[in-house]
C-alpha cells in the first residue's frame, strides 16, 4: 500500500491498521480445507462488525485502539520464517507446468462460497486464476501474459482502478455496475453489461498490504492465501495477479450483499505487487500492463476510500459515448460530512467543503467551456484509453506521466532530479491533463460532468492538512509553469482555429492566475511574519 493511501478515515482507520501485537509467533503455513478458509473469513467479518458496534459506543481513544481479530490464513501467509527449522518445514516442492513460460494456476474457490452463488456454470465463477508476473509492467503483454476478459473475447467498455479496494469504495463500484445492468433500453448496457466492465485492484507491496483487507477480498473470492510464489523459473516475481468474477459485495458495515440485494457479477483483477513502489508504479501496471491486453474504451480512476454515486460511473461514461473528442472527464468531488453534516463543526472540514464547492461551481465549469481542465482529480476521474496511449515513437501523455516514477528511481540510484522536475511531478496528474490536450496531431478535450460525483474524506487534523497542501501547492505551481512554457505544443495539435483561440484565452487566464497565486503566498507569509 502506498504512503498516499495510508489514511482511510472513519472507523476504518481503527480496525484496518496493522497491529504488531496481533502477530503470531508461528510462521508456518497450515494447510486448510477450502470450506474452513471461507468459514474463518466469515468469522473475521463477524468479529469486525461486532468491533465496529463497540467502537461507535465507546470513547475516541477506545475507538482508535486495535481490535482483537480471529487469525486467518492471510496472516500466516505473509509471515516470514524466522528459524531454519520453520523454513524447512514450509518447503514443499511441486512441479507445475508453465503456460508460455509463465506460471498460471486455476484454483477452485471454497465450497461454501461456491454454494452461495447463483451462477456457477463458468470457470470464472468457480475458479480463481493466479498469475505470477516476473516482468515489468511495460513488458507484460510481450512476455506472453494474458487476462481472462481477453481469453473470453470480451470487449472492455470500462476499466476501473483503485490502489486498495476497501469496502466503501468497492460496494459503491458494484452498485454502479448493477445500475449499468439495469439499463435495459441502452444499446451498450443491459443484463449482460457486467461483461464489459473490469475492476482492477492494485495493492502496493505484499509485505505492507493490510491483512484485514485481504480477509475481505478472500471472503469475496478475489484472493486466496498460500498460492503466491516468490520465484518462477529462477526469476523473481514482480506482481501476483488474481482474477475472479465475484458475485458478492461487502458494505462498510461488513454486511454481505448478494444477488438478492441487486448485486451482479463483477470481473475483478487483484494485482498484489511484491514490493512497495508508490502510486505511479501502480498506475503503470494499470495502464501499461493490463491496458494493452484489455484495450478498454474508458478508464476510471478512484482514490482510496472514495465512494462514487450510484449512477456516477454511468454519467461519466455517457460523456465519452456521446462525444468522441472527449479524452478525459471528471465529476464533482464532495467532502464527506457525516450524519446530519456534523463534520461541518470542524472549521478545517468546513473550509475545505467551501473550497470544493467553489471549485465545482466556478473553476471547473469555466475550464470545461474552453476544453482544458487544469487538473482532473485522481480521486474520481476518467480517461479515454486511446487518448492516453503513446505514439509509435513511444512519446505521448503516458510517457510524460511516468517520468515521475523514473525521477523517484533516480533518487535511489544517487542521481538527483532538478528542483523544477522534483516539484512538478508532485502533481503528475496536471502534467497528464496538459499532455493529453496538447497531444500532437490530436484534438482531445477535457470536460466536467456535474451529474457525476464522488464522496471522499478530507483532512480533519492540521498536520495532515498541511502535509497535503504543501504537496498540492508546490506541484500545482510548477506544473502550471510547465504548461505555460510548453504552450507552443498546442499549435502542433490537431485543434481547429476556434478551439486554439479559446485555449489561448485560457492560457492568458492561467498566467494571471499563476501571478496572483505567487503574490498571494507572499502576502500570507508577510502577514505571518508580522
Swiss-Prot record:
Biased composition (Polar residues): 24-56
Record note on pH: Optimum pH is 5.0 to 8.0.
InterPro entries linked to this entry: Chitin_synth, Chitin_synth_fun, Chitin_synth_N, Nucleotide-diphossugar_trans
Keywords (A to Z) from UniProt: Cell membrane, Cell wall biogenesis/degradation, Glycoprotein, Glycosyltransferase, Membrane, Transferase, Transmembrane, Transmembrane helix
Compartmental location: Cell membrane
Transmembrane segments: 477-497, 508-528
EC number(s) reported in the record: 2.4.1.16
Topology in the lipid bilayer: Multi-pass membrane protein
Pfam families the UniProt entry points to: Chitin_synth_1, Chitin_synth_1N
EC supergroup of this enzyme: transferase
Region span, Disordered: 22-94
PANTHER family registered for this protein in UniProt: CHITIN SYNTHASE (PTHR22914), CHITIN SYNTHASE 1 (PTHR22914:SF9)
Role: Polymerizes chitin, a structural polymer of the cell wall and septum, by transferring the sugar moiety of UDP-GlcNAc to the non-reducing end of the growing chitin polymer.
UniProt name for this protein: Chitin synthase 1
Gene behind this protein: CHS1
Amino acid at each position: 500500500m502506498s504512503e498516499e493511501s495510508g489514511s482511510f478515515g472513519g472507523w476504518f482507520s481503527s480496525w484496518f491498521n496493522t497491529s504488531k501485537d496481533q502477530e503470531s509467533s508461528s510462521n508456518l503455513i497450515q494447510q486448510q480445507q477450502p470450506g474452513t478458509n471461507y468459514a474463518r473469513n466469515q468469522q473475521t467479518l463477524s468479529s469486525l462488525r461486532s468491533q465496529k458496534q463497540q467502537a461507535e459506543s465507546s470513547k475516541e481513544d477506545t475507538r482508535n485502539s486495535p481490535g482483537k481479530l480471529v487469525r486467518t490464513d492471510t496472516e500466516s501467509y505473509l509471515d516470514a520464517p524466522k528459524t531454519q527449522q520453520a523454513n524447512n518445514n514450509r518447503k514443499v516442492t511441486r512441479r507445475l507446468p508453465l503456460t508460455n513460460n509463465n506460471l498460471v494456476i486455476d484454483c477452485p474457490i471454497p465450497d461454501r462460497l461456491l454454494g452461495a452463488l447463483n451462477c456457477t456454470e463458468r470457470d470464472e465463477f468457480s475458479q480463481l486464476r493466479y498469475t505470477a508476473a516476473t516482468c515489468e509492467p511495460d513488458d507484460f503483454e510481450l512476455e506472453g501474459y494474458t487476462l481472462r476478459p481477453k481469453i473470453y473475447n470480451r470487449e472492455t467498455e470500462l476499466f476501473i482502478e483503485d490502489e486498495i479496494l476497501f469496502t466503501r469504495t468497492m460496494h459503491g463500484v458494484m452498485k454502479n455496475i448493477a445500475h449499468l445492468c439495469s439499463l435495459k433500453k441502452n444499446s451498450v448496457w443491459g443484463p449482460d453489461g457486467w461483461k464489459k466492465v473490469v475492476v482492477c485492484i492494485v495493492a502496493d507491496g505484499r509485505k505492507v498490504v493490510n491483512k484485514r483487507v485481504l480477509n475481505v477480498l478472500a471472503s469475496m473470492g478475489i484472493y486466496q492465501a498460500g498460492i503466491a510464489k516468490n520465484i518462477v523459473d529462477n526469476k523473481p516475481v514482480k506482481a501476483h495477479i488474481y482474477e475472479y468474477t465475484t458475485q458478492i459485495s461487502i458494505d462498510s458495515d461488513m454486511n454481505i450483499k448478494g444477488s438478492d440485494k441487486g448485486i451482479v457479477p463483477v470481473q475483478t483483477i487483484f494485482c498484489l505487487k511484491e514490493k512497495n513502489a508508490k502510486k505511479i508504479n501502480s498506475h503503470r501496471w494499470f495502464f501499461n500492463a493490463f491496458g494493452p491486453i484489455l484495450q478498454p474504451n474508458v478508464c476510471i480512476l478512484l482514490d482510496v476510500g472514495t465512494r462514487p454515486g450510484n449512477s456516477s460511473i454511468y454519467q461519466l461514461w455517457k460523456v465519452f459515448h456521446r462525444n468522441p473528442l472527449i479524452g478525459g472527464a471528471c465529476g464533482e468531488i464532495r467532502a464527506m460530512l457525516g450524519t446530519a453534516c456534523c463534520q461541518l463543526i470542524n472549521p478545517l472540514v468546513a473550509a475545505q467543503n467551501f473550497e470544493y464547492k467553489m471549485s465545482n461551481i466556478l473553476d471547473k465549469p469555466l475550464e470545461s467551456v474552453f476544453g482544458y481542465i487544469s487538473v482532473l482529480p485522481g480521486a474520481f476521474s476518467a480517461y479515454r484509453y486511446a487518448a492516453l496511449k503513446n505514439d509509435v515513437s513511444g512519446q505521448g501523455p503516458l510517457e510524460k506521466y511516468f517520468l515521475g516514477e523514473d525521477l523517484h528511481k533516480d533518487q535511489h540510484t544517487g542521481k538527483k532530479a532538478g528542483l523544477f522536475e522534483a516539484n512538478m511531478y508532485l502533481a503528475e496528474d496536471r502534467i497528464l491533463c496538459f499532455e493529453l490536450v496538447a497531444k500532437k496531431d490530436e484534438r482531445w478535450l477535457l470536460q466536467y460532468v456535474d451529474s457525476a460525483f464522488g464522496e471522499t474524506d478530507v483532512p480533519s487534523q492540521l498536520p495532515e492538512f498541511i502535509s497535503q497542501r504543501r504537496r498540492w501547492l508546490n506541484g500545482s505551481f510548477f506544473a502550471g509553469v510547465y504548461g505555460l512554457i510548453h504552450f507552443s505544443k498546442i499549435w502542433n495539435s490537431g485543434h481547429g482555429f476556434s478551439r486554439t483561440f479559446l485555449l489561448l484565452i485560457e492560457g492568458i487566464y492561467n498566467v494571471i492566475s499563476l501571478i496572483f497565486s505567487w503574490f498571494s503566498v507572499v502576502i500570507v507569509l508577510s502577514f505571518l511574519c508580522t
